[in-house]
Amino acid sequence: MRYILLEYDHPQEDEAKQVYSELDRENRETRRVELYPNGLWFAYGDEHGREEALSADPFPEDVRTLNVPGEVSARTIAPGVFREVWDQAAERPDGFLSMFF
């Protein structure tokens, strides 16, 4: 497994600011957590379900090729960083429900 973080410099309110992804041996997404500027979190894959929201296309071997100066930066992160974010996402309501908590 590999873990990556995409950070968007100027997201709109309905676009994720940070996207944490877990990739399998074929560089396909198996789990993802999206953090939005307004504080919402969305998690996909594993116990959160919604696998159809995961990227069907494999990520490039060198994720730095996804970097676009002034728009998005991509980098590999440690497995523990992803697990911490994943666990936090599991403890939070996501989407519409977070308005009530």
Name what the model sees in each region:
Residues 1-16:
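Short, extreme N-terminal segment that most often corresponds to the first beta-strand
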Residues 24-68:
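Acidic, aromatic-enriched beta-alpha/helix-loop junctions
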Residues 6, 21-24:
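N-terminal phosphate-binding or glycine-rich loops at protein starts, especially the Walker A/P-loop
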